[in-house]
Every structure is written in structure tokens, then in C-alpha cells.
Amino acid sequence: MTPFPPDSVDVTAQVPRQLQVHDVRAPAETIDPATRTPVKPTFSVCIAVRDRSALLVNSIQSVFATGAADVEVVVVDDGSGTPSQEGLADAGLLADERIRLVRRPARGIAAARNTALAVARGRYITVLDSDDELTADAFDHLRGLLDATGAPWVYTDYEEITNSSQRVIRMPAYQSPPEMLRAVLTRPRLPFKHSGMTIDRRVLTDLGGYNEDMRIKVDVELVLRALRHDILPVRLGEPVVKFRRHDSNISHKRLTGLGAWYGLISEYAPRRSRLRMKAYRTASEIAKWGVSAVGR
């Protein structure tokens, strides 16, 4: 596994001076726009993006619509053809001091998320996919659970939105790390959504961040590694993320994905269960491929 490198962020783009593009060695303060006073963020909403400027703007605006003052947004542009700052400029967000943007050559989602982790200053990392949005009460719900439980890792229910429907997807809760680990490896549908996860930054850093040796299933590997270290994510039974289903977020690389699953099962499953789990995973991936082939 390639370790998380806290002092090796590669920031190469030449950008307008008024845009905050930060190396980890030069952090800036977040300013409360109402009082113009510095605020140390509690939450760093981390977004990795490539070539989704319009969706990125929607994601960022959803964060600000929560009204939370102790939040920063860290955006890592992972080699977009059109730099993300152009979309931010068009949306009037270019000089917003709550946004911290790093543009870097394309190195993949794991490296982009590690860059965001290195730049972030909040106590908690809230992961947000660039095509997802937070609900207006997201931080109210997250704060309530974090204060009540002291949990270092939270996953949540979410809203799934299509052109014709909208529904809340309820996630299961688990009593122990081994129970959740088995579910992650065998359930046809993942028992968590990475977007919306909120993780104590120190815990995520101590785990080594994201595994840059993996190209896909990066979120799954991270959760499995946490579970192996006896960290049990706690479920928040409220949807805090709006997930808009569209063609570009449906995986069509089932064979590649199946190979990644085999590797994860070999790494994290008990030896006596590996063949059975691989059979379960093969059947579920073939079934999902069939659903994708005939259309949703």
C-alpha cells in the first residue's frame, strides 16, 4: 500500500491570484462571511473532481446552503481538462474564502482524496462526491450524533434521485467490526455510501489515508481497513446526501470490479470463508451487470 504522504502535495497550476489554491505548507484561515472573523473549521468537506464543473458548483452551493459557519470546502481538481476555477468563477464563487482549491495532474481518486486530507484543517472530514449534494440539515444531524456518541466515523442514509423518482435509502447498522466486515464483502449492495461519511481527521490520517495502489474500490478498501483496526463506523439514520443517479455514475466495468473484489476478499476475509465469499460476490456482480444491461 502506498502510504499517505502529508508533505508531498503536487500543486502545479498557474491560477488567478484571487483564487485560493493552497499547498499543505501554506494553510489559510476560513472567514465567517457574516462577521468577517476567522473560524477554525469543525468540518472539512472534501471533494475530488475531474471534468464536472457544473455539478461541482451544485455540490459546493449545497454545503453553503446548510448555513454552517464552521465549515470549509476543500476541492482537489484531479487533472480536469477545463480547470475547475473557471466554473467557480462563472458561479461567483471564485473569491469565497471558505473554498480551498488544489489543482494537480491526474493521479486518480485515492491520490486526490489524500491531497484533500493533507490540505484539510477541520476536526472531521466529510466526504462529498462531486455529483452529490448535502441536505440543508446535514450538519445539524451530524453534530447531534457526534456529540451524543463521540463516534470517530459516521456513515448515513441518503436520498437517491432519478429523473422519475426520489427515495431514501436506509443503511443497516452493525454491532461489531467483524459483522460489518462480512456484510461489506458479501452484500450485493454496499451497506454504506462513502459520500456523506464523516471521519475524525486524526483517525483517517493514522490509518494511512487512502490506498493509492488501488484504482477502484478505494472507498471499500478504506472501510475494510478501518474495520480490521477495530474501528466501527456508526450509522446516522438520517439522509444527509442527495445522490442523483445518472449514466456516468453507473459502473460498467464489472469484470475489473470483480477482480478488485477478489483481491479485497483475499486480503480481508477469514481464510476459511474466502471461496464462499468470492462465489457470493461473483453472483451479485453478474446480477448487477444484467440489471445495467437491460436498463434501470
Language model feature labels by segment:
Residues T2-L255:
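Nucleotide-sugar donor-binding/catalytic module of glycosyltransferases
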